[in-house]
Amino acid sequence: MAYATNADVSARLGTFTLDGTTQPTTTEVDALLGEKSGQLDAVMSSLGVTTPVTAPASFTDYLRGLEAAGATADTLAIMFPDASGPGSIDETIAYWLGMWTGGLEMLKDGSAIPSGVTLSTAGLPSSYLTNNPDAELDLGDIAEPAIKKGAVY
């Protein structure tokens, strides 16, 4: 499920328009949105968030903006593949790409995921220490240094 639409990308393109004859076409932009949505869902699933996210509305709005930013960067890169240099569309592409990657990093570290998001309990990695955070594991002699300060050999 894509969080954003063609209209969200078009709003970020300013004077550039999308239709069935442009490069990329609206169908191709829909495919870009699907790719970005898949990337968002993959990151959130790895953190235990149930996807696709449907609530809270503020978080789905955030995801819509983030997905649209990533698709806008890709769309502009397709529209202007040879753009480079100061003052070129390259700076605009970098801006939207920065919005996408920055938001994706915030999702990865969990800082963009609000409380109230439905979490899944299936498939998350676990270990003795994650299941028993207050227990200290007795490592025996393995944790003792082989050479001790002040020891006479």
Predicted regions, residues:
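Conserved short "hinge" loops at termini or chain/domain junctions
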Residues: M1-Y62, T121-Y153
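Short loop/turn elements at secondary-structure junctions
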Residues: A4, A73-Y153
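Alpha-helix boundary/N-cap detector
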Residues: P24-A31, Y62, L66, G87-E91, ...
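Surface-exposed polar/charged interaction patches
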Residues: Q39, S46, T50, A69, ...
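Elongated alpha-helical scaffolds
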Residues: D61-T75
